[in-house]
A protein has these predicted regions:
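N-terminal anchoring/stem segment of glycosyltransferases
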Residues: 1-59, 72-73, 147, 179, ...
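A structural signal for well-ordered alpha-helical segments within the folded catalytic domains
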Residues: 15-18, 62, 66, 167-175
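A structural signal for short, well-ordered beta-strand segments and their strand-loop junctions
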Residues: 34-36, 78-81, 86, 101-103, ...
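Short, polar loop motifs at secondary-structure junctions
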Residues: 35-43, 84-90, 190-193, 212
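A short acidic, often aromatic-flanked loop/helix-cap motif at beta-alpha or helix-coil junctions
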Residues: 41-43, 55-61, 108-110, 191-197
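GT-A fold catalytic core of metal-dependent nucleotide-sugar glycosyltransferases
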Residues: 52, 61-115
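Conserved catalytic core of nucleotide-sugar-dependent glycosyltransferases
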Residues: 94-159
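Catalytic core and acceptor-binding pocket of nucleotide-sugar-dependent glycosyltransferases
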Residues: 133-219
Length: 230
């Protein structure tokens, strides 16, 4: 069983990423954890290294992919969102067959996409489901090296700038998957990074994704039980 590296990008309040790091340390104590952030965000104990970059908080998707590229991590890693708690060991044995693994959306994938989400004009996706438009979640991605993120950043910079604020990472994942440039594998979100609604109905996933502000208190409460601290 080999330990895996973890990478996350975050700016602003660090309560949730601190809990993420503690959960990784509980179940993957020997893993390297890389924190990418701006010059204002507080430091986080327990990470292996911190990369501080110039970030545009109005264009978080661009800053995120730029950070993953600038880290230049030339070894396998899981790139993970910060509203997540790891609840069992995640090892490289999960990722032995392919160079890249994407998190496949399954929860509420048939819901119709909101064409004015966060003020974005997504009218080009009218009458399409969220699963059709964004089949992959950007909350949990495995890559063998940083080249994948350089390509994703190039894609994001080539599309409509409205996606630089939101959905840009998912746009890039769909486009790069369709390009067939990489040897891709897929892991269902219910297995690798489930929302609480799924995680309570089946065998425990590897991690729980407390997506959205409404689940922040739930993440804190779960961490208190899981980690024995807030």
């Amino acid at each position: 069983m080999l330990d895996i590296n973890f990478v996350f990008f975050h700016v602003g309040d660090v309560q949730q990423p601190r809990l993420l790091v503690k959960s990784i340390r509980k179940f993957n104590p020997d893993s390297n954890i890389y924190f990418i952030t701006d010059n204002e965000t507080e430091s986080i104990d327990g990470v292996t290294d911190t990369l501080r970059i110039e970030c545009d908080r109005e264009n978080l998707m661009t800053s995120r992919l730029n950070g993953f590229s600038q880290l230049k991590l030339n070894k396998p890693a899981v790139y993970i969102d910060t509203d997540i708690l790891v609840i069992q060991p995640i090892t490289s044995n999960l990722f032995i067959e392919h160079d890249v693994y994407l998190c496949l959306r399954s929860h509420q994938k048939d819901n119709m996409i909101t064409t004015n989400y966060r003020g974005l004009d997504l009218s080009e996706y009218s009458k399409k489901s969220i699963g059709e438009v964004y089949p992959f979640l950007a909350c949990f991605t495995y890559t063998k090296n940083y080249n994948f993120w350089e390509d994703c950043l190039e894609i994001l910079n080539s599309i409509d700038k409205k996606f630089h604020f939101w959905y840009g990472d998912q746009e890039a994942l769909r486009i790069i998957n369709d390009s067939k440039k990489y040897d891709m594998g897929y892991i269902d979100e219910s297995i690798i990074c489930a929302v609480p609604e799924i995680s309570l109905k089946r065998n425990p996933p590897y991690s729980i994704h407390f997506k959205g502000k409404k689940h922040k208190k739930r993440m804190i409460a779960t961490a208190e039980i899981l980690l024995g601290e807030k």
